[in-house]
Amino acid sequence: RRVPFHARWRHFEVGGRDRWAALAKTLKGDAAERARIRVELAITSVLLDAGAGPDWGYREPDSGERYARSEGLAVASFDLYRRGGFSNDPAKPLRADAEALKRFGAPALAMAFQVFPHNPLIGLAGRAALIASVGGVVAARPDLFGAGARLGHLFDHLAGQAKDGVLPVTLIFATLLDAFSPIWPSRLDIEGVALGDVWKHPAARAKDRTDGLVPFHKLSQWLAYSLVEPLEEAGVRVVDLDALTGLPEYRNGGLLSD
């Protein structure tokens, strides 16, 4: 039996409901457009996922069920995307473009995620700011996101890098690091490039500028895993998955320790 990828798509299936499959049945257009939608959904949802705190939860309108933590954030972000929360075109809700992303703010996120005094979400403003910064990146990189400045055009760029329909996962990962390095809070940098989820440790020895640095890139790796299924559904075979690591966080660390 094939074990599913550790990707955001598993959270969209919480409660025994495959929300993506249900949405996909309503889609019109070719496989590439479907893949663009999946890429946008994965990226925005992953970037909105962080510790929600013990008191927050999301009541799903369709089912009436309440979900908390990562599962709740997944369902809430799925609904936000589906309703056109990242689209600048009311006639085309299933898209994430630079203009809508750039103006995304905490009030819109609070409304979409049902945040009230009795249902507080940790890091609300920071999450919204991260999405807005993605809009700036999408606008500034037509080489990755096309002249139309749409987040989903990252699919077209990645598919164009495949050779004979085959794409190494390391190329997906490197593209994500290149594309989104400006959005991360800067602790460490090399020649003005923010390194993101990279930390110092004296045991990490190297003979170049990475001396003393340990890369984790948890969210970027999770994004890479989460883009595999959209690409493969569109006919791009992703290979060399073992080149990535397990996500460096407490649950996976505990699993490896066990």
Feature-to-residue mapping (PLM):
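Extended, well-ordered protein cores
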Residues: R1-D258
